[in-house]
């Protein structure tokens, strides 16, 4: 998937998310092997030729796709309801970047007010470390709002309320369905 920024708003998010889901549906993946070790090797090393991330392994594509879904569904949630805890955000569109290695996953501007954000999809066992790393990445940046969007099931075995949000650091847990049908029903 190209790393160029996408501008998402209420007028285009459904269409763009539907196209992204179609890319996921087009993904060809290795079938189960009789040898479990061979299957795991293919999962981690065999390059895909389709989907949003061709030329990476299914394992890597899965990591990227689920992080992308956190961004898509988080921005959709923000566009439909601008409240994050007790903070109302003034933004009507968000600039997002998928599979970002440098910079931020999302940004928004509304006149003189600026937001930067990061998003991730992580297992519950890695949640605290990933959250701490993300807070550290954002804390010294210059923005009116800093936002962290993450998969809500990462909170399993942790406090259901990760941190208390305030404008200097907002936390948005997002439910990410496990099937394409469930996601399609959300949009």
Where are these regions (language model features)?
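Acidic-basic catalytic patches of nuclease active cores, encompassing PD-(D/E)XK
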Residues: 47-95
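Active-site beta-strand-loop-beta-strand hairpin of nuclease catalytic cores
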Residues: 104-117
